[in-house]
Amino acid sequence: MKNLCLWLVSLLFFIWVPTASAQTAEAPPPPTPEIPSILTVSEAAIATGMEGLTPQGAADSFESSVGKLYAFTKIAGADEETLVKHHWFHEDQLMAEVELPVRSASWRTYSSKTIAPAMAGQWKVDILSQDGNLLKSIPFTIK
């Protein structure tokens, strides 16, 4: 009797194991890595003023008496809310860092910087993504 029970248990085991493995589904393929959005700067300018979100008096050279300048940026390609940064440099010295929200795939924004008459020289505004990648640099001169 003991041998018969052992034999039945063995038979059930050999029948069950192949059946169970035959019913096992293949593992799903690994998820495709999400391709990050690629931000681009579709428009950028240094200007003496802003009317709404439109730069006024855009140029690449300004008088030292200008008083205040605006760095305008139009961002394309954001598929979720993110940030861009404006880094204002005078003669390669960082003068200001400004974080600006980007809330849609096409977004216009700007920052401003007060310019003292003694700040003549070479300037640039670097536009960076949230993770610090340089998107565009806008050089300009204060005379």
Language-model segments: what does each one mean?
Residues 24-65:
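Short, compositionally biased P/S/T/A/G/V-rich stretches that sit at domain boundaries
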Residues 7-17:
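Bacterial N-terminal signal peptides
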Residues 115-116, 124-140:
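Short, exposed beta-strand-loop hairpins at the edges of beta-sheets
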Residues 69-76:
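Short edge beta-strand/loop segments characteristic of extracellular beta-sandwich folds
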